[in-house]
């Protein structure tokens, strides 16, 4: 069973459909977009003082909008959807870190 699944996957990777997918914007658009969530995840190690609330909010709205787009477009672009879902979660975490930081500053003042 596993051998048949591997064989089927290998046949698909060698197919013209897969090559066409690799050369389409349905593949390269999300690949380029992965820079946003990677940067947000990397910024989680940094001080919350550098977080911009406005930019975090804008990126949350952007990712929600394009998650909907990736779902509605035909054929559905699951790679783009996953990219923006990851970015949405990362930005919400960054927003939470910013709020926690601002609250602790007010509490200590």
UniProtKB/Swiss-Prot annotation:
InterPro entries per the UniProt record, alphabetical: MPC (IPR005336)
Catalytic activity line of the entry: pyruvate(out) + H(+)(out) = pyruvate(in) + H(+)(in)
Keywords, alphabetical: Acetylation, Membrane, Mitochondrion, Mitochondrion inner membrane, Transmembrane, Transmembrane helix, Transport
GO biological process: mitochondrial pyruvate transmembrane transport
Compartment annotation: Mitochondrion inner membrane
Protein name: Mitochondrial pyruvate carrier 1
Membrane topology, as annotated: Multi-pass membrane protein
Positions of transmembrane segments: 21-41, 53-71
Mother cell cytoplasmic compartment spans: 42-52
Taxonomy, superkingdom: Eukaryota
Entry annotated with the keyword Plastid: no
A GO molecular function held by the record: pyruvate transmembrane transporter activity
Protein role: Mediates the uptake of pyruvate into mitochondria.
Subunit and interaction comment: Homodimer. Forms heterodimer with MPC2. The heterodimer is the more stable and dominant form.
Family indicated by similarity: Belongs to the mitochondrial pyruvate carrier (MPC) (TC 2.A.105) family.
Sequence ranges on the Mitochondrial matrix membrane side: 2-20, 72-109
CC annotations in GO: mitochondrial inner membrane
Residue list for modification N6-acetyllysine: 72
Primary localization: mitochondrion
């Amino acid at each position: 069973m596993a051998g048949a699944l591997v064989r089927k996957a290998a046949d698909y990777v060698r197919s013209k459909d897969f090559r066409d997918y690799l050369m389409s914007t349905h593949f390269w658009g999300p690949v380029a977009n992965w820079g946003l969530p990677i940067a947000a995840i990397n910024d989680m190690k940094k001080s919350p003082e550098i977080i911009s609330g406005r930019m975090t909010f804008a990126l949350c709205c952007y990712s929600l909008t394009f998650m909907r787009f990736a779902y509605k477009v035909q054929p559905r672009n699951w790679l783009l959807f996953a990219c923006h879902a990851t970015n949405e979660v990362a930005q919400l975490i960054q927003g939470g870190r910013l709020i926690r930081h601002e609250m602790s500053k007010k509490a200590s003042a």
